[in-house]
Amino acid sequence: QHACTAGQYALITTVYGNASLWGMLLAPLSIKKIGKGKTLLLINTLNIVFIGAIYPIVKYADMSIMIWLVLICLWMNALVGAFGHILSPSINGDIRDYQQYVSGERIDGMFAAVGLIGSVVTMATSSVLPAIYEKVGFNEEKLQELLPLIIAQEGPLDDPTNVYNVLYHKETFIAIFGVLIAASVVGAAMNVIPYFFYDLTEVKQQGIIKVLKIRALFEDYGNGILKDSDLVETIDIIKQAKALECAQPKDIKAYKLAIKQAKDKESKKVAKKEYNAAKQYNVDIEISKMVLEEMARFDTTFGKIQLDQARKTASLGYDAIYNFDSSELANAKALPTGTPEEKVFRKNAVSVAKDFVYAQKVAKKKFNNNIIEFDSSIFDKLFNREDDISAKIEEAYARLYKANDEKDNDAIAHIKAEIKELKKERSIIEKEIKNATTENSLYARAARPVIKAQKLLIQAENYTKLEEIESLYEEAKARHEQTMEDARIEAERVEAEKKAHAAKIRAEKA
C-alpha cells in the first residue's frame, strides 16, 4: 500500500525492535507494584487493545500518518508482550510450587508434556487462518479478477502469478487485514480468560514456600538427613509464626496518610520507611496463618479424617484397591458444597475416589490384580554399572588417543573393538534403566492410593517430633554460625590472595 519508503521502513524496524528492552525493564516494577496476576491481566488486556486499534487506523487514517500510528500500536504491543519474558519463568515456578503444595508432588516434567500438547494444537489450527484468507479473496481467482486493475494502478509486475499481488488492491487488502486482526484479537481474548482465575498472590506464594520448607524439615528429619542450615531457618519460621499468632494487622491507610502529611524530605523518608515496615508486618501475619495452619493440619477435623482414611487404606494394603467400589466416586461428587469446609471435604473425597478408580484399572490391566512392590534399589545398581562403564569408555578413549599419537595400529584396532563392546554394554544398561523406569511408573500408578496413604501417615508421625527438632536448635544454630564464619574467613583469604597476586604481577610489570 506504499505506506512508507525504504528508509522509513528501516527506521521503523529499528524503533520497533527496541520495544522489548523497555518491556523487560518495566516488568519487575509492575510486578512489585501490582503483583504478577494483575500484571498478567493488564498486559494481555492491553495486547487486545493495541492489536484491535490497528484495524481502524489502517482503514481510516490518512496515508501520511498511518504507518506511524501503526508503529505506535505495534511498539506498545511489543512492549507489553516483552513482560512475558520476565513473567513466564516466574509464573511457571510459582505454579510448580503451588502444585507441590496441594499435591505433595513436584511435576516439573509434566510442563514439557503440556508444551507438546500446545504444539499439536497449534499444528491442528494452523490451517484455519489460510482457509479464511482464501474465503475473503486471497486466492488465484481473485488475483485474475483484479489483475488488470492492479497492473493499471501499479504498472508491470515482476511476477503476475504471485497471489500476494491481490494486496495491492486496497479493498481486498483491508478485508484480509481485517481477518488477521480479528483472529489476533480473538486469540488474545482467549489467552486472557484463564488469568481471571489466577488467584495466587505474592503473599500466598511466600507462604507456600515456607510451608514447603516446613514439610521438608520434618521429612528430612525422619530420613536422618536434616542440615543445620535448614533446621535453623525453618525453626525460625515456626517461631516467628507463633509470635504473630495473635497479632493484628496495622492500618496501612494511616501510614499512607502520614506520608502525605509529612512536611519535609526527612519526615517523608521516615514515614515511607514506617509504611513499608507496616506492609511487611501485615504480610508476615498472613504468612504466619498459613504456617500455623500447616503445623496444626493433622489436628483439624479434616486432617483427622484424612488420617483415618490413610490408616484404613494402609492396613488393607493393595486389597483396598482391588475391592474399591467405583460407585464411591459418584457418591463423592454428590457431597454438598454449601460451605468452604464442605467444598474442601468434597474435593478431597473426589480426588481420593479418582485415585482408587484409576489405580484399580491399572492394577487389573497391568498386574492382573496382583501388585508386586517395585524394588527401587535396582536403580542404584544400574546407575553404578552405567557410571563404571562410562568411566571405562573414557579411559579407553584416553588410551586410543595415545595409541593414535604413537601410530600403534594394533593397539588402535584393539581399543576400538574394546570401546565398541563397552558401548554395547552401556546400551544394554540404558535399556534396563528405561525398562525399570517404566515398571516403577506402572507400580506407582497402580499402588498410588496405598503409597499416598503410607506417606501421609509417615508425615503425620514426623509432625509429632517438633519438640525433638526444637531441642536441636541451639546446637545446630551454633554449628551453622560457625560454618558461616569459616566460609567468610575463607572467602576473605581467597580474595586477599587474589589481590596480592594481582599486586605482584603489577609490580613485576613495572
Sequence positions of predicted segments:
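Membrane-embedded alpha-helical bundles of multi-pass transporters/translocases
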Residues: 1-226, 230, 273, 282, ...
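Intrinsic disorder in cytosolic terminal tails and internal cytosolic loops
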Residues: 166, 199-405, 411-510
